[in-house]
Regions:
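Active-site loop ensemble at the mouth of alpha/beta enzyme cores that anchors a bound cofactor
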Residues: 188, 220-300
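N-terminal glycine-rich anion-binding loops that anchor highly charged ligand groups
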Residues: 17-48, 61-63
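Active-site-proximal beta-alpha core segment in soluble small-molecule metabolic enzymes
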Residues: 39-178
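C-terminal accessory subdomain/extension
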Residues: 273-368
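Flexible, glycine/charged-enriched surface loops at secondary-structure junctions
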Residues: 34-35, 205-213, 341-344
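Conserved, mostly hydrophobic/aromatic
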Residues: 18, 41, 71, 134, ...
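Generic N-terminal amphipathic, Lys/Arg-enriched alpha-helix
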Residues: 1-13
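Active-site loop/helix belt of alpha/beta enzymes
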Residues: 131, 137-250, 254
Length: 368
């Protein structure tokens, strides 16, 4: 059917642009001599994860255990869970995940001795060995052990405990992904992790603690890590390329990132025009995430979106500008793809104005 036959608000992706973005990032990562482990919290759909794997990705990332369960049920067999877990229920779910999918590989990120002890206890009871990756603080001041003795002791604890194994380190600087300016962003991304790689060379390697995997990076910072020591990149948003990432600049343009094309859109409808300079559409905060800024109205110059609450979006434009009428459809480019996907049940794939397929967003709401 034609895209204009969709009920609004609806979430859709330009399938050709998305596929081009997938291929482009894979080639860029290959050219850097790294491997790509895309973060699927961006899309939350096993079928799209499989497209990324088919293009050359070596595995995937998920943010939460719930997303891992969705991806494993969808047939994905190499999954890194990038957020630490705590509590017996979560740990037992991790064990059950291994038991339910014995042919799959799961790596759990941790940053505390508690994780080692509790996961090892549950894994040993189930006759399993769980692979662990240690998160290292890399500037974001979120999770992560400090580089130094604490890191050495945590690695030693894993290496000396049955039921778990040490596979590597995660150093993800999420706070730098949207730094504007290609050179500035890359300089900051490298400088914040240089102490880690110096420590690996000076301390971890001589003690037999060399990480097999060093994972991190994102759509904004992946290019900074060539030759630094990372083995895999966790970029995710590149396949949709939301408005926030478009604004960070690239190697040729200081204000616009043209490495990838904006593919994710929201289709909305004009429902009211109270004044000549104010138009209201049916896309509010329940469908458009605004944590990274306001969405962009596609194809119409001089129009500014303002949230009007849960179900309303307000478009501001010059008075007397006859550009909208009631019932007209408007396309918006979301500012943050990850959280916008979490507002919808369905993602429609569109090609040349036609809906060619649709996916259930299976990982929606799976922050558990």
């Amino acid at each position: 059917m034609d895209i204009n036959q969709l009920e609004t608000p609806s979430l859709f992706v330009d399938i050709d642009k998305m596929k081009t973005n997938i291929k482009a990032m894979q080639q860029r990562i290959n050219d850097l001599g790294l491997t790509l482990r895309p973060h699927t919290k961006a899309h939350k759909i096993p079928a799209i994860a499989q497209m990324q794997l088919d293009a050359g990705a070596q595995g995937i990332c998920v943010a939460k255990l719930g997303e891992a369960e969705v991806m494993a049920q969808g047939g994905i067999k190499d999954i890194l869970i990038t957020t630490p877990i705590a509590g017996q229920k979560k740990i037992q779910r991790l064990i059950t995940l291994h038991q339910d999918h014995p042919d799959a590989r799961f790596i759990q990120v941790i940053d505390d001795y508690y994780h080692v002890v509790e996961i090892a206890k549950a894994a040993s009871a189930a006759n399993l060995c769980v692979e662990l990756m240690i998160e290292v603080e890399s500037g974001q001041q979120r999770c992560g052990v400090q580089v130094g003795d604490d890191l050495v002791q945590l690695i030693h604890a894993i290496q000396s405990t049955d039921g778990v194994s040490y596979v590597g380190l995660q150093a993800y600087s999420g706070h730098l992904q949207h730094v504007k300016g290609y050179c500035s962003r890359n300089e900051q991304a490298r400088s914040v992790v240089v102490p880690l790689f110096d420590f690996i060379t000076s301390t971890l390697e001589p003690q037999g603690m060399t990480p097999q995997i060093i994972s991190g990076g994102g759509t904004g910072t992946y290019a900074a890590y060539q030759g630094l020591g990372y083995s895999e990149i966790q970029a995710g948003s590149y396949l949709f390329m939301d408005a926030a990432y478009l604004a960070i600049g690239d190697e040729t343009n200081a204000t616009e990132n043209q490495q990838f094309s904006p593919a994710l859109k929201v289709l909305s409808t004009v429902i009211s025009q109270p004044t000549p300079s104010r138009t209201v559409i049916d896309a509010g905060m329940k469908c458009l995430s605004i944590d990274l800024g306001m969405p962009i109205v596609e194809g119409i110059e001089g129009v500014r979106y303002q949230t009007g609450g849960d179900e309303h979006g307000i478009l501001h434009h010059e008075e007397g500008c006859e550009i909208f009428e009631l019932g007209q459809q408007v396309i918006l480019l979301p500012s943050h793809c990850d959280t916008t996907l979490n507002n919808f049940d369905t993602l429609y794939a569109v090609q040349d104005g036609k809906v060619i397929c649709q996916w259930t967003i299976e990982g929606r709401g799976r922050s558990d």
